[in-house]
């Protein structure tokens, strides 16, 4: 389904289904077969959403066929690199003394439940109301307890989320740690700029920010990716990113933040694999996405 300006979704449709897909990949990375990350909540959350293909994926029921292009090791390794990047970002931020955290587009992220937050840490989770409600109720049914003070901010990021965040107790006068994981590609360019302008306006000196971006979303229309997508569709993976993302080049986000006083450090997906002791795949599909860029930044003003 092609995006519209005011489209809505839950965890089984449109952009929301990508959150379930990401959680399924985290579940694989946490599975004892790979044991690359620690996330005991990913698999039960995916099963609760009940999208057939992702339930089968976390249950090990997707047939492995070399000709299909489905490599069961690729998903957990790539997601482990991504998850470790954001996990370490929050560990470093809180060790520096930051006690206020904001997870933008939190989806099925369970960091408020699974990370060992220092005493006094407040974690704000921002996402669509139905997404927040589903995760909260599902984790409660699982008996999960937050390891920090968790505050939910149920709002569409295309609306005045900054006001809703502050109404939930966010204090813009103290440093904060922000993440925008798996978000930017689903925002129009002007909305991306507005998002970071809001983050800057709400951030005290010393605040930190982590995000990843696809330098040029034309990769989702690359012939190599389209061929791979067709093969994966036969296995039931129906999400077509080409319809869900907003196209254009996004590398300028670093310059945008620099003008506002953010000092950034970036690593490509290929570099992140190497830093985690993992080999980046050497094939056409991997080559398409080798330049996905992971960035952390500190606000100096």
UniProtKB/Swiss-Prot annotation:
Alphabetized InterPro entries for the sequence: Ppm1/Ppm2/Tcmp (IPR007213), SAM-dependent_MTases_sf (IPR029063), SAM_mthyl_Trfase_ML2640-like (IPR011610)
SUPFAM superfamilies registered for this protein in UniProt: S-adenosyl-L-methionine-dependent methyltransferases
Annotated S-adenosyl-L-methionine binding sites: 127, 156-157
Top EC group: transferase
UniProt signal peptide: none
Record EC number: 2.1.1.-
GO molecular function list: methyltransferase activity
Recorded superkingdom: Bacteria
Pfam families named among the record's database cross-references: LCM
Keywords from the named record: Methyltransferase, S-adenosyl-L-methionine, Transferase
Protein purpose: Exhibits S-adenosyl-L-methionine-dependent methyltransferase activity.
Family according to the record: Belongs to the UPF0677 family.
NCBIfam families the UniProt entry points to: mthyl_TIGR00027 (TIGR00027)
PANTHER family in the cross-refs: S-ADENOSYL-L-METHIONINE-DEPENDENT METHYLTRANSFERASE YKTD-RELATED, S-ADENOSYL-L-METHIONINE-DEPENDENT METHYLTRANSFERASES SUPERFAMILY PROTEIN
Name of the protein in its database record: Putative S-adenosyl-L-methionine-dependent methyltransferase MUL_0450
């Amino acid at each position: 389904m092609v995006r519209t300006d005011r489209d809505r979704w839950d965890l089984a449709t449109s952009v929301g289904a990508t959150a379930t897909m990401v959680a399924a990949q985290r579940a694989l990375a946490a599975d004892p077969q790979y044991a690359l990350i620690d996330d005991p909540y990913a698999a039960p959350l995916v099963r609760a959403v009940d999208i057939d293909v992702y339930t089968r994926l976390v249950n090990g029921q997707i047939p492995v066929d070399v000709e299909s292009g489905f490599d069961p090791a690729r998903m957990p390794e790539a997601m482990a690199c991504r998850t470790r990047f954001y996990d370490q970002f929050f560990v470093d931020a809180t060790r520096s003394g930051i006690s206020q955290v904001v997870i933008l587009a939190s989806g099925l992220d369970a960091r408020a439940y699974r990370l060992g937050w220092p005493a006094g840490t407040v974690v704000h989770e921002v996402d669509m109301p139905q997404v927040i409600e589903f995760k909260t109720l599902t984790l409660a049914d699982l008996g999960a307890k937050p390891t920090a003070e968790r505050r939910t901010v149920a709002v569409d990021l295309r609306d005045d989320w900054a006001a809703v965040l502050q109404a939930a107790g966010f204090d813009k006068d103290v440093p904060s740690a922000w993440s925008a994981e798996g978000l930017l590609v689903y925002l129009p360019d002007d909305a991306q700029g507005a998002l970071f302008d809001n983050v800057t306006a709400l951030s005290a000196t010393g605040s930190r920010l982590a995000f990843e971006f696809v330098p040029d979303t034309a990769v989702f229309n690359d012939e190599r990716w389209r061929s791979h997508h067709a093969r994966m569709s036969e296995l039931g993976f129906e999400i077509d990113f080409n319809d869900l993302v907003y196209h254009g080049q996004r590398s300028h986000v670093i310059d945008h933040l620099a003008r506002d006083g953010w000092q950034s450090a970036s690593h490509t997906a290929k570099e992140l694999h190497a830093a985690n002791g993992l080999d980046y795949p050497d094939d056409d599909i991997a080559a398409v996405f080798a330049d996905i860029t992971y960035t952390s930044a500190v606000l100096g003003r």
